[in-house]
Swiss-Prot record:
Protein residues bound to Mg(2+) 2: 98
Source species of the chain: Allokutzneria albata
Binding annotation for Mg(2+) 1: 93, 98
Broad EC category: lyase
Protein's recorded name: Bonnadiene synthase
């Protein structure tokens, strides 16, 4: 890939009043997770190991689950490593995976459908046993030994939702067309894939949620807000990386710039204001409703808090975003996100954002 000449954008600190936490066994979780991933032949050798360590995916899991069993936290770290498949499947970025999978699947919808079906029926070998499929099915097997059937069904449903939204994003890239901002808001919450990690919270934590717990309007609202915050924050952190790949950059910043007819630099504070307003609403709804929830639902909401904070704290120093092509500083500029947090929102308006599918969060 011939990288474009791109300068990283200045991203201001993000409002997040949730304190940072981290698992005391991070070093062990990281070692075992990278060993597991490299065991399938991906990111081989010391160079691959250094790249994975710089990305800090085990730290994301360790920050999201700072008190849970280390081996269960490692399953999440393994899964986050696996989702680098997104680079090939959705973003058609092969800059660091050419040695494993030389091209994106020609029919994403067919691949996605078969992949989900294999999670539902693990004995059905519907796709070739390449390293990505073998590692995914290993995760499925391990989860099946500790998760209840309804928990596996929720995780598989979250996986399906992610791949459906990802198909939309892939279409936009292939059509070289930016979606409208309203459509992007609808797409991005699911396309972020975080629902697949969050769906594992009860498994990692060793508790059981009921369908009623998750269907409660307040829990639905904070879940959707958390997923949206993480997705939009990822857009801010990953913009430099995405801008270096071929095709249009389907990112909140670019969509705002395209819709408003402004520069990318001017779109950044608009994106930050949007996420800050959602962060304010998240905290208000969360604090108002937590006392009315049962023990399991309270633990689940606490995991949402930690995911929001973990994503910011990991992303701010991950070389996946600061040095996406893994080049010396003399060859490629670095993105910098320090400080990553602020105690003051850039927009604390109590009014709903003007998008019909999320306005109900302010009801």
């Amino acid at each position: 890939m011939n990288p474009r000449t791109v300068q990283p954008l200045d991203v201001p600190p993000l409002y997040c009043p949730i304190p940072p936490e981290i698992h005391p066994d991070l070093a062990l979780i990281e070692k075992r997770s990278i060993d597991w991933f490299q065991g399938f032949g991906v990111f081989p050798g010391e160079a691959g190991r250094a790249l994975l360590r710089g990305w800090q995916f085990p730290a994301l899991a360790a920050r999201a689950y700072p008190e849970e069993d280390a081996e269960r936290v490692r399953i999440v770290a393994d899964f986050v490593h696996w989702t680098t498949f997104d680079d090939v499947l959705i973003d058609t970025d092969h800059s660091h995976v050419d040695d494993v999978l030389p091209g994106a699947p020609p029919d994403l919808l067919a691949v996605a459908t078969k992949m989900v079906r294999m999670l539902e029926v693990p004995d059905a070998a519907l796709l070739p046993g390449d390293p990505w499929i073998r590692s995914l099915m290993d995760l499925r097997r391990r989860l099946g030994t500790i998760a209840a059937p309804e928990q596996m069904a929720r995780w598989t449903g979250a996986f399906r939702e992610y791949l459906l939204a990802a198909t939309w994003k892939r279409f936009c890239r292939q059509a070289r067309r930016l979606p409208s901002l309203a459509d992007y808001v609808t797409m991005r919450t699911a396309d972020g894939g975080v629902q697949m990690y969050v769906a594992l919270s009860e498994v990692v934590g060793g508790y059981r949620l009921t369908d009623r717990d998750l269907a409660t309007p307040a829990v639905r609202a904070v879940t959707e807000m958390a997923l949206t915050l993480i997705a939009w924050d990822n857009d801010l952190f990953s913009h430099y990386k995405e801008s270096l790949t071929a095709g249009p950059c389907i990112n909140l910043i670019d969509v705002i710039a395209g819709e408003r007819g402004c520069s990318l630099e001017d779109a950044v504070p608009v994106a930050v204001a949007m996420r800050d307003r959602v962060m304010c609403r998240y905290m208000a709804v969360r604090e108002r409703t937590e006392r009315d929830l049962g023990v399991a639902a309270r633990r689940y909401v606490r995991s949402l808090d930690r995911w929001i904070a973990a994503n910011i704290d990991m992303s701010a120093t991950s070389t996946r975003y600061t040095n996406p092509l893994n080049r010396p500083a003399t060859e490629m500029p670095r993105a910098r996100f320090t400080p990553a947090r602020t105690d003051l929102p850039s927009d604390d308006s109590p009014l709903a954002l003007p998008f019909p599918d999320i306005a109900w969060w302010w009801d």
